[in-house]
Design a protein with these regions (language model features):
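Acidic/polar, low-complexity linker and loop regions
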Residues: 1-13, 43, 47, 51-55, ...
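Short helix/loop capping segments that flank catalytic or ligand/cofactor-binding pockets
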Residues: 18-21, 32-34, 46-47, 96-99, ...
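A broad, low-specificity signal marking well-ordered, structured residues that form hydrophobic/aromatic
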Residues: 7-8, 21, 86-87, 253-254, ...
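Active-site and adjacent loop segments of nucleotide-processing enzymes
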Residues: 170-175, 179-183, 190, 194, ...
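Alpha-helical structural motif
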Residues: 6, 30, 34, 38, ...
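Non-catalytic, regulatory and substrate/membrane-recognition segments associated with hydrolase enzymes
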Residues: 1-85, 92-93, 108-112
Length: 347
């Protein structure tokens, strides 16, 4: 029983009313290692799909791959684009609403496609990497296409969580905390998105290219230059998923850790932290008198300045964010002269 993930609750204090997030703590779960290896194999498959989608984009100017790695990846994608209209959406029930039969059906097609394109029988996985291979190896786990489907079905059919003295089986969705959970969600949404763009392109190429400025980071979706996107949401994704429009201003949106403003089509970027909007104070940087070494604590300041510099389009935005950070760290015991020494390293 100790090997069954323990479910615990985290409040979303910034929501009104206060929201909930349930996590399955699977650190000691009996399928932990299998799920970890499966996660690496899924990432390899997703990378194959990314490379394939890049080729499609180069040849036909169609965006099959909306997934981004981080905010810098997203900025590289859109910073030189002229965008007058922006929207952001949130998949509020992504993990809890994914239908198991839908996952199995879509993944069966994806696995077959990828293995056939690669022309290799195996995905060899160890703790460091995963790769396609013509033969299995003794020092790693070797997965055929049939093995991948068996693992997927086993993982989905054996999701149990422990709550107090009771054990529950999850029959819809996947738990947050499962190693391969994020990869399963990402790959499933990718299958919906790519299939829809491909389908539309055969009927209306101009409309299909309207999706070129769509980007998604797991359950956060950005849509640029496509005012009618909302008409397509439930043609792309199943209605089991609850998808909410987050933005209320087409000229200024917050996405990931970015605030994006459209000024006559040109994009202006600055740093956004949703925790700044909380009605209560939080501690997200170390105190100088904590157990953290002084050098490491000052390194946090330096790394944040680099992040601000990479994101901010205008010097004024960088200065405002840096000034706020300095004031916060001073309240937490940092000396101004130490911060200034670190700041000089940027020049």
């Amino acid at each position: 029983m100790q090997d069954i993930p323990l479910i615990y609750w985290i409040p979303k204090m910034h929501k009104n009313p206060i929201g909930s997030r349930f996590i399955a703590g699977s650190k000691k779960c009996s399928i932990k290692l299998l799920s970890k290896y499966f996660s690496k194999a899924l990432k390899l498959i997703l990378n194959h799909m990314k490379l394939y989608a890049n080729t499609v984009y180069e040849r036909s100017n169609l965006n099959y791959f909306w997934i981004i790695e981080n905010s810098l990846d997203f900025m590289d994608k859109i910073k030189n684009k002229s965008i007058e209209h922006m929207e952001t959406y949130d998949f509020s029930t992504l993990y809890t609403a994914l239908p198991h039969p839908e996952i199995k059906r879509n993944f069966s097609k994806i696995f077959q496609k990828v293995y056939n394109r690669e022309g290799k029988q195996f995905i060899n996985v160890n703790l460091r990497q995963a790769s396609f291979s013509s033969e299995g190896k003794n020092n790693c786990c070797s997965f055929r296409v049939t093995d991948m489907m068996e693992i997927l079905e086993f993982v989905l059919d054996n999701i149990f969580v422990r709550y107090g003295r009771k054990i529950y089986k999850q029959v819809v969705g996947i738990p947050i905390g499962l190693d391969s959970g994020q990869d399963i969600a990402n790959l499933l949404l990718f299958s919906y998105e790519s299939e829809y763009v491909e389908k539309v392109s055969k009927q209306d190429l101009f409309l299909a290219r309207k999706f070129n400025l769509c980007s998604r980071y797991i359950d956060d979706l950005f849509v640029g230059g496509f005012p009618n996107f909302k008409d397509h949401i439930y043609k792309i994704y199943p209605r089991d998923l609850e998808i909410k429009l987050e933005s209320n201003n087409i000229k200024e949106v917050s996405y990931l850790d970015l605030k994006i403003r459209s000024e006559e089509g040109r994009l202006d970027f600055s740093v956004y932290d949703k925790r700044d909007d909380f009605s209560f104070e939080i501690v997200n940087f170390p105190f100088i008198e904590s157990c953290i070494h002084k050098k490491s604590a000052l390194g946090v300041f330096y790394s944040q300045l680099i992040r601000y510099a990479r994101i901010c389009s205008k010097c004024e935005a960088f200065k405002a964010k840096a000034h706020g950070l300095v004031n916060r760290l001073k309240r937490q015991g940092f000396k101004l002269e130490d911060l200034r020494k670190k700041e000089r390293n940027l020049s």
